[in-house]
Regions:
Chain A
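Alpha-helical transmembrane segments
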Residues: 8-23, 95-108, 172-193, 260-263
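Transmembrane alpha-helical segments that form the membrane-embedded catalytic/substrate-channel core
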Residues: 21-30, 108-118, 183-201, 272-281
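Membrane-interface amphipathic/juxtamembrane segments adjacent to transmembrane helices
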Residues: 27-56
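Cytosolic juxtamembrane amphipathic/interface segments immediately preceding
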Residues: 48-66, 124-125, 216-223
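Transmembrane alpha-helix boundary signature
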Residues: 57-60, 79-95, 114-123, 153-159, ...
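Juxtamembrane/interfacial segments at transmembrane-helix boundaries in multi-pass membrane proteins
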Residues: 96, 150-182
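Mid-bilayer segments of alpha-helical transmembrane spans in multi-pass integral membrane proteins
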Residues: 102-117, 138-155
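Interfacial loop-to-transmembrane junctions
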Residues: 277-303
């Protein structure tokens, strides 16, 4: 546990929690402008959260503790990833947890917890959403593991800080075929895992087409605020990981205030640009039919597999 | 994709300039909601004229979302119930249950003449009454169907923006 790691962990937690709703607001604003609307402003998700926290808390009849602890667990697990993953600094606050397998497992676990809560609510849409989410999750997790594993092959370590550190020392590796294939595979993973188009439409009102939203239809008030904050944080963490792995420049390698400030600014700018790009791309996409989603995810798994193969064959 | 991009470039901003913000004369809960209102729409027996206008109010031209109002899929997520149409027999219980599912603080907006006083459907055999006969109504929007501007104005009274 180094000073750099601890400073990074604290900064990352603050930036992700404070910035995740703003990222969501930015993405909605980009979409609104491209649709010809004026948009509610970047701060709207924070206004929504402030109002939800003040609202009455409701636990629907027939729900158990699973339903009540799920939002807390979702935020907690995502927060752990936000603290340990190399986003602002190349060192980690808790190095053993900053492992590729642990981070991917934590993010998957958060999804499973919400899926269980969806089942626990006992409504038709909750169960349907949970079944869909778990289907997507089962197809996405191998891709995420294999894609990041392809990046760890030349490093010889599955520790994320080491992977990012080596990429910084040897930037040529970032444009190798293995890295590019892994980037495309991981992009598909992020789109599927964070419920963006073309896999899931985050702004839909039609229950029958929902994946993520269908599981959380029964949440209200402060619990809903946690679920929304957790979902926004997941998106920021995934995008932050993606930019750290493939565009690592700007990340802090020393514990000086200047380097840390630069690391924070670099993270915010990179994630903001990638998020805005994703939102702009979504305007041009329609949602895929649910039965076509596995084809997309199988394609991304193939790319990840090719990435690992080329990483071994081409070195 | 290229043609869509050209359409986006050609149309630019379709939203009309925002009218002056409302004087704070809305329902008392507007202060508690503080600029964010999630709206659940309930069709209690409408002819779908009001639905078209609500759709227009959230469309690019009137853009109710810029004032902090957003349509949601679940009454649990909602702060405001927008009810249209005279309440028909089959919709009395669903409307009441939807009202109960919304957490406090909440607002009920009756949109259109049918929701206010049953309009042309008054005393029809399938109609129980106006929305106010079933759940307490905080705001009413006049018109058959109401213009999108008046719907947006009512929603702005709720958001206070």
């Amino acid at each position: 546990m180094s000073a750099l790691g601890v400073a990074g962990g604290v900064l990352q937690a603050v930036v992700i929690v404070g910035g995740a709703p703003l990222l969501l607001g930015l993405m909605r604003q980009v979409r609104a402008r491209l649709e010809g609307r004026a948009g509610p402003g970047v701060g709207q998700p924070w206004r929504d959260l402030r109002k939800l926290v003040r609202k009455q808390s409701i636990s629907p009849r027939g729900t158990t503790e699973v339903f009540r602890v799920a939002p807390v667990l979702l935020v907690a697990m995502t927060l752990v990833v936000a603290v340990v993953a190399p986003l602002v600094t190349t060192a980690s606050a808790v190095p053993p947890v900053a492992d590729l397998f642990v981070v991917v497992a934590l993010l998957a676990h958060a999804t499973v917890v919400i899926a269980l809560a969806g089942l626990d609510s006992g409504t038709a849409f909750g169960g349907m959403g949970a079944s869909r989410e778990v289907t997507v999750l089962a197809l996405v997790e191998p891709t995420a593991l294999v894609a990041i594993f392809a990046l760890s092959v030349p490093t010889g370590s599955t520790s994320l800080p080491t992977i990012v550190g080596t990429a910084l020392d040897d930037p040529q590796r970032l444009i190798s075929p293995a890295s590019l294939l892994a980037a495309v595979a991981l992009a598909a993973v992020i789109v599927a895992e964070t419920g963006r188009l073309p896999v899931d439409n985050p702004s839909t009102h039609l229950e029958l087409t929902m994946i993520h939203e269908a599981m959380v239809l029964e949440y209200a008030g402060p619990d809903l605020a946690l679920v929304e904050l957790g979902s926004a944080m997941r998106l920021s963490v995934y995008l932050g990981l993606f930019t750290s792995l493939f565009v690592p420049w700007g990340i802090a390698t020393t514990a000086t205030p200047l380097a840390l400030a630069l690391g924070v600014v670099a993270l915010v700018v990179k994630v903001g640009v990638v998020g805005a790009g994703l939102a702009a791309l979504e305007v041009f996409l329609a949602k895929l039919r649910l039965f076509r989603v596995p084809e997309l995810l199988a394609g991304s798994f193939l790319l990840a597999l090719l990435a690992v193969t080329t990483a071994y064959v081409l070195g | 994709m290229l043609s869509l991009w050209r359409a986006i470039r050609r149309l630019g901003r379709a939203a009309e300039p925002a009218p002056a913000p409302p004087v704070p004369a809305g329902p008392a809960v507007a202060a508690e909601l503080a600029g964010s209102v999630q709206v659940r729409h309930v069709d209690a027996g409408s002819c779908n004229g009001c639905e078209l206008e609500i759709g227009a109010a959230f469309g690019p031209v009137y853009d109710a979302e810029r004032y902090g109002a957003r349509l949601v899929a679940s009454p649990r997520h909602a702060d405001a119930l927008v009810v249209t149409g005279a309440v028909t027999r089959n919709m009395v219980e669903p409307l009441r249950r939807t009202y109960e599912a919304v957490g406090e603080p909440k607002v009920v907006v009756a949109v259109g003449d049918c929701a206010r006083n049953c309009g042309v459907f008054a005393e029809a055999y399938g109609v129980v009454g106006a929305v106010a006969d079933v759940v307490p109504v905080d705001l009413e929007v006049v018109g058959c169907p109401p213009r999108p501007e008046t719907i947006v104005a009512a929603l702005r009274l709720c958001t206070g923006r």
